[in-house]
Regions:
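Extended, charged alpha/beta regions that create polyanion-binding interfaces
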Residues: 246-252, 256-263, 267, 271
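Charged/polar positions within long, soluble alpha-helices
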Residues: 126-133, 168, 185, 189-198, ...
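Conserved amphipathic alpha-helical "coupling/scaffold" segments
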Residues: 1-181
Length: 304
């Protein structure tokens, strides 16, 4: 999933801007005064505002108009935009306050931590889906239209049900089922973690299960080498799904990290607009023109 709220066809990089004239420009235009008004003492908002504005000096008409459309939506639906921004902060902070990733040496610990984080993330994803369903009709911009349509397409009820089912199976597993293929020298290769057969049975079937032909062996309680080998096989199987879950966690975290960064700029714009309203001063969305046209028209300019 992509955010695409600062650019119509890509996520914003928001890397540090190194302009040779940035210090002079900041001082001459008192840009820090603007950034502080947008940030309201939030260091993250301050930095995003600074980087976004300076990196936007070379934006084309399409990008400027695209952002203005989204900005107008933000002004009309400020509480909704702030709620989405708060969700992104909540998810990122939940990662910082979890035990996830501390015991990465042990696959079982990675799996347990990944399951816990996915469940936290699912709760926040469901909140985002609810906000989308309740407010999608209130937004008119191309940016938010694409964003909300993506949320409804990707985060369906079936998606949530399927993920929850997988998590329940992983958390309440009764042993593990792993398949192998035989390689050279009859060494096991291409391990795969399989889903356990979890057919519902009545009490009679549980007491007298149908017999099926299978081959098995038991390890002697004192066979330390055998127990160690079995433990390694167990960890290998768990590691397959643990890595997959960890990648899913990282994907969700990346999405909300980008969402926070891009909405931080619009949150700063909302902060600035609200302060101008308190001062009862006007604001507008200027019409951009090419620099070669040398058009410069304004009215009701004021000092703040």
């Amino acid at each position: 999933m992509n955010v695409f709220l600062l650019y119509p066809n890509r996520d914003a990089e928001l890397k540090p801007v190194h302009l040779w004239h940035a210090p002079d420009l900041t001082e001459d235009l008192e840009m820090n005064f603007l950034f502080k008004a947008m940030a309201l003492e939030d260091d993250f908002l301050f930095e995003v505002a600074r980087v976004t504005i300076f990196s936007g000096l070379k934006n084309d008409f399409e990008t400027i108009i695209y952002r203005q459309e989204i900005g107008k939506d933000c002004l009309k639906n400020s509480s909704v935009v702030r709620s989405i921004y708060d969700l992104s902060v909540e998810l990122i902070e939940s990662r910082k306050h979890s035990w996830y990733g501390i015991f990465t040496k042990y696959p079982s610990s990675v799996l347990s931590g990944s399951i816990g984080m996915i469940e936290v993330y699912l709760t926040i994803l469901k909140k985002l889906r609810i906000i989308t369903d309740e407010n999608i009709g209130k937004f008119q911009s191309r940016g938010f239209g694409r964003f909300f349509s993506m949320i409804q397409t990707e985060l369906t009820d079936e998606y949530f049900d399927e993920i929850q089912q997988h998590l329940d199976e992983l958390r309440n597993r009764n042993g593990i089922l792993i398949s192998y293929e035989l390689g050279k020298g009859n060494k096991s290769i291409d391990s795969k973690l399989l889903r356990l057969h979890n057919k519902k049975q009545n009490w009679f079937q549980k007491l007298f299960p149908p017999k099926s032909q299978y081959y098995s062996f038991d390890i002697h309680p004192r066979d330390e080498s055998g127990a160690k080998a079995l433990s390694q096989i167990n960890d290998e199987g768990i590691n397959l799904v643990a890595n997959a879950l960890a990648q899913s966690n990282d994907h969700i975290l990346h999405f909300f990290t980008m969402l926070r960064k891009e909405l931080a700029f619009y949150t700063g714009c909302l902060n600035l607009h609200e302060q101008l309203e308190e001062m009862k001063e006007p604001s507008c969305f200027p019409n951009p023109v090419a620099s070669v046209e040398r058009k410069y028209s304004f009215r009701e300019m004021f000092a703040v």
